[in-house]
Design a protein with these regions (language model features):
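Short helix-initiation/N-cap motifs at beta->coil->alpha
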Residues: 45-46, 97-107, 236-244
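Sec-dependent signal peptide recognition
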Residues: 2-8
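A short, structured surface patch at a secondary-structure boundary
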Residues: 62-113, 117-123
Length: 325
């Protein structure tokens, strides 16, 4: 189903790899699946630390996406960042503690929650800065990094090892992997039939900025790469620093994708509208002329979609194959 927004052109709002990261290959490999006598699970986290977890009862997550993964692994959360409620709509217990915004978490509130295990982000400076304090307090903490589906799958595997719910690893992990593999196979056939890969421009927009994103270290970029797309920001890195309409016109991508950052949806749409109005040459782009400019739903392409990763791939491939869902 399409939802139109008129901003000098129609942007369709859709509901909602192959590329290996060093983190996935080297820093989150499980060293020991399970010690049967102690139920202790030992693994290496994203900071290269050896972490041993023994049947935690009070788990806190410093990102909503990590809280979601823990739930998908059959666990419960006693404290998390506000996006666990606002973005992921998790069924947290009434007494769960809101630690605040992801970049402004309260260490005091975390201590109030009295966790025995904390899921933290190696990509978030504040999380990493808490490491020594948490270790000094005797609180077990593991750091993770998730940029694409394979990262998610590995974190889910570790979490289901800890919870003992390997059935949920099958349901929320391996089944999704099979779904994605089928979509990627379809994309290869699409490219073979077309004789060439589509070119794309990925733009992250908020109410105050619009920036180009390449294929690395972001959800949409990784998906587009896996589906065989050529992101013009990969070869024109200057676009990452300076969004030049002139350079975009020279590259003339087949598709343009906007993803929303932040919670101000109306402000984001207004900013996109103003960006287009200030650049009349925009209307000369092939993607615009062919109606291939899309505003993608935040929950599938800006946030970590976790068990909805397969759905996100399917909807994106639907656009690229002109069979939108």
């Amino acid at each position: 189903m399409r939802f139109g927004i008129l901003i000098l052109l129609t942007i369709f709002l859709i509901g909602c790899g192959n590329q290996h990261t060093q983190y996935r290959e080297t820093t989150i490999q499980t060293i020991e699946e399970q010690n049967e006598e102690t139920e202790e699970h030992v693994f290496t986290d994203a900071l290269g630390r050896t972490v041993a977890v023994n049947n935690p009862k009070r788990v806190a997550a410093l990102l909503g996406s990590f809280a979601d993964i823990w739930y998908l692994a059959g666990g419960e959360i006693i404290a998390s960042a506000d996006d666990a409620w606002d973005d992921f709509k998790l069924p947290l217990p009434e007494d769960a503690i809101n630690l605040g915004m992801t970049k402004e978490l309260s260490l005091e509130k975390l201590f109030e929650a009295n966790p025995d295990f904390v899921l933290a982000s190696s990509n978030t400076k504040g999380n990493v800065e808490w490491l020594e304090t948490l270790e000094a307090a005797g609180i077990n903490v593991a750091y993770f990094e998730v940029n694409d589906f394979q990262d998610y799958l590995e974190v889910l595997r570790i979490c289901t090892d800890i919870t003992g719910r390997k059935d949920l690893y099958e349901k929320n992990g391996l089944a999704i992997q099979e779904q994605i593999e089928n979509v990627i196979a379809q994309s290869k056939q699409r490219i073979e039939n077309a004789g060439q890969a589509p070119t794309v421009l990925s733009l992250r927009a908020s109410s105050t900025f619009i920036r180009a994103k390449n294929s690395k270290d972001n959800v949409l970029g990784e998906m587009l790469f896996a589906l065989g797309c050529e992101n013009i920001a990969d070869s024109e890195e200057s676009l990452l620093e300076n969004l030049s309409i002139e350079q975009i016109i020279i590259q003339d991508p087949d598709y343009i994708f906007f993803i929303q950052q932040g919670d101000n949806e109306d402000g984001t749409k207004e900013n996109i509208k103003n960006f287009i109005a200030e650049n009349p040459a925009w209307s000369e782009l092939t993607a615009v002329k062919n109606g291939r400019v899309y505003l993608l739903e935040k929950s599938l392409y800006a946030l970590k979609p976790n068990d909805r990763w397969g759905e996100a791939y399917e909807k994106l491939e639907g656009i690229l194959s002109n069979e939108e869902m």
